[in-house]
């Protein structure tokens, strides 16, 4: 199980990302379409002044049950260990063990 501080840090990042998503998107759009070099520098500095954790790339997918950061299935939000256990217990609807 992951440390609670790491899980809380991820929650904080998700919250910040949602808060600054619109502002970041508009600044990036202006930056990409701008032709003037001086205005581009100004927009770049505004983007850099936004909180670092408000960037979407800083978010790490974690298992919602254990907080494990690696081996997470996106569809279920579970790590591979928990996914296997829950699938064996028939707690995941529509998931069956394959056989051929």
UniProtKB/Swiss-Prot annotation:
Any one GO BP annotation for this protein: translation
UniProt GO cellular component terms: chloroplast; small ribosomal subunit
Chief location of this protein within or outside the cell: plastid
Swiss-Prot/TrEMBL keywords: Chloroplast, Plastid, Ribonucleoprotein, Ribosomal protein, RNA-binding, rRNA-binding
GO molecular function: rRNA binding; structural constituent of ribosome
UniProt-annotated location(s): Plastid, Chloroplast
Pfam families in alphabetical order: Ribosomal_S14
Protein purpose: Binds 16S rRNA, required for the assembly of 30S particles.
Assembly description: Part of the 30S ribosomal subunit.
Similarity comment text for this entry: Belongs to the universal ribosomal protein uS14 family.
NCBIfam families attached to this UniProt entry: PRK08881.1
Full protein name: Small ribosomal subunit protein uS14c
Native source organism of the sequence: Phaeodactylum tricornutum (strain CCAP 1055/1)
């Amino acid at each position: 199980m992951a440390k609670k501080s790491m899980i809380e840090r991820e929650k904080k990042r998700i919250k910040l990302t949602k808060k600054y998503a619109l502002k970041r998107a508009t600044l990036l759009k202006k930056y990409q379409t701008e032709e003037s070099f001086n205005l581009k520098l100004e927009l770049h500095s505004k983007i850099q002044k936004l909180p670092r954790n408000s960037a979407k790339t800083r978010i790490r997918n974690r298992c919602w049950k254990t907080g494990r950061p690696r081996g997470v299935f996106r569809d279920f939000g579970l790590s591979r260990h928990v996914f296997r256990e829950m699938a064996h217990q028939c707690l995941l609807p529509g998931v069956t063990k394959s056989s051929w």
